[in-house]
Amino acid sequence: MRALITGVSGQDGTILASMLAAQGFSVVGLVKPGTEYSRLLRYVPGVEIAEVDLADHSGIRSVISSVAPTHMWNFGGFTAPGDSWDHSDEVFAVNVDSVRVMLESLQRVSDSPRFFQASSASIFEGVDRAPQTESMQPEPKSPYAVSKLEAMQLVDGARRDLGLFGVSGIFYNHESPLRGVGFVTRKVSHAAARIAAGLEDRLELGDIEVARDWGWAPDYVRASILMINAEVPKDYVLATGISHRLSYFVEKAFAAVGIVNWQDYVFSTSENTRTVDTNLMVGASRAAYLDLGWRHTIDFDSMAAIMVAHDVAQLADPKATWEI
């Protein structure tokens, strides 16, 4: 079996590559030219890397033709919703146009390939009801969210009209030690470790009472494997169904390094506060539980502790890895 993964050097791509390699897959990963991927190679030494920009349609076609994947996951693309208004051309080029090219190219592969599209809860950002389900009408507001919905529609069309086994997983927030430091949960775990070590003395955040449906990233990647291998291709909401405030994550992260009085180190600043936030984003994954047998393996408190423990380990050894 041959897997092709876009965005392979990111959190989800690295976790997926590790899981698939353990299952005996031959794994090829796409990264944007110039991307640093040494971390990926520490986790999955045998992965083959192809440097292709998702805006390079001929490059995408060439890789798919040469690899002839039996399974393909699209985890790549523009991933910063807040910046999407300033980069809308890029957003639609890499989040929508590239998906069309992938689907067209896969049609020419003879092994009846299967395709997974990583979608986003942001397609529901304008919905004022919670929890959100697969049957709800999406209400995207940002260019990023619109691009994610359009990509889903392309996959649905390829499934319906072309007979391609294509599915979209509607991912809610999911975290792990491999999350980038630019994401708020990793920013918190990283700072907690450094403050406990005496390397920093404050952490500046935006609104710490913002609430999100945060889950454990490896569980979501496992869901994508279940979806792409299912008998019937269907789209699913992938979420915990539980909302937590950021302040609670901060509390648990600092507690993991023995700091109870976290309020002495954490400060909310207007510079870090979003001018417009989304409605309450909580997903209902009952369909995935029933159809796929999907389950969560790590709770919220444990997730915070694991992330902090890895950041502590990396203070001693920057190349320390975490067992996926």
Task: Provide a role label for each language-model segment.
Residues 116, 130, 167, 181, ...:
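Residues that recognize and position ribonucleotide moieties
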Residues 59, 98-101, 150, 187, ...:
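Charged catalytic carboxylate motif
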Residues 29, 185-186, 192-324:
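C-terminal substrate-binding subdomain of Rossmann-fold SDR/epimerase-dehydratase oxidoreductases
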Residues 15, 42, 62, 86, ...:
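Generic recognition of short, well-ordered alpha-helical segments
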Residues 1-174, 298, 322-324:
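N-terminal Rossmann-like NAD(P)+-binding domain of SDR-like oxidoreductases, especially those catalyzing
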Residues 136, 140-147, 177, 181-185, ...:
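The catalytic Tyr-centered alpha-helix of NAD(P)H-dependent dehydrogenases
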Residues 146, 150-158, 187-191, 249, ...:
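Hydrophobic alpha-helix immediately C-terminal to the catalytic Tyr-X-X-X-Lys motif of short-chain
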Residues 43, 52, 56, 180-181, ...:
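Residue-level signature of the cytosolic catalytic core of signaling kinases
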